[in-house]
Design a protein with these regions (language model features):
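Solvent-exposed alpha-helices and their adjacent loops that cap or buttress functional pockets
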Residues: 28-30, 97-101, 124-125, 157-161
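Active-site and channel-lining beta-strand-loop segments
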Residues: 26-48
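Glycine-rich loop-to-alpha-helix module at the N-terminal edge of alpha/beta enzyme cores
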Residues: 3, 44-132, 140
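Fold-independent oxyanion-binding glycine-rich loops
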Residues: 17, 40, 48, 111-112, ...
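Short beta-strand-to-turn element immediately C-terminal to the catalytic PLP-Schiff-base lysine
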Residues: 38-39, 57-59, 147-148
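PLP-dependent aminotransferase-class I/II
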Residues: 32, 136-165
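Active-site-adjacent loop/helix segments that line or gate small-molecule/cofactor pockets in enzymes
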Residues: 1-33, 87
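A non-catalytic, amphipathic alpha-helix used as a structural packing/dimerization or gating element
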Residues: 9, 13, 67-70, 89, ...
Length: 165
């Protein structure tokens, strides 16, 4: 794929300012709408990655934009020392939809890696230390998540990893 000089200049700035976890990106995206994204040159693409599974509603969905805008106008984020009505209502909805047994609770995470780490901690709380991981899968970049990841190139630089996988 050929990119414009303007896009190439941005990619060079990226290279100079980022750690290349995924290597050099192929495009510099400027905006999105629904399932489509546009690069800084105005070229339109179908977003087949969905933000690697985090943009299930697509880009710029009006109801999502309205909900985010409303919440940002009230409180953007609070630490775990506090809570909000929205957090309580979201947790109650998850428990209701999951038909969770009485006494169940919710722990909201910032990322998939944090969710994996939490699952490891919860399983260890039972006294069981063995972990079953999905072969061929990527589980995240934290030490615990890398311990479950199949690809040796991701694992080797951080060994020794968690035992019992």
């Amino acid at each position: 794929m050929t990119v414009s000089a303007a896009q190439q200049a941005l990619l060079e700035r990226y290279r100079a300012s980022h750690i290349g976890v995924f290597g050099l990106p192929g495009l510099v995206l400027a905006r999105g709408e629904g399932a489509h994204v546009w690069d800084v040159d105005g070229n339109r693409y179908l977003d087949l990655l969905g933000g690697i599974a985090v943009n299930a509603l697509g880009h710029g969905h009006p109801e999502l934009v309205a909900a985010i805008s409303k919440q940002a106008g009230e409180l953007v984020h609070v630490s775990n020392f506090f809570t909000t009505t929205a957090q309580i209502e979201a947790a109650e909805a998850v428990l209701r939809i999951a038909q969770a047994p009485e006494g169940s609770g919710v722990f909201f995470c910032n990322s998939g890696s944090e969710a994996v780490e939490t699952a490891i901690k919860l399983s260890r709380r039972t006294g069981r230390t063995g972990i079953v991981a999905v072969g061929g899968a990527f589980h995240g970049r934290t030490t615990g998540a890398v311990s479950l990841t199949h690809k040796e190139a991701y694992r080797a630089p951080f060994e020794p990893l968690l035992p019992g996988v």
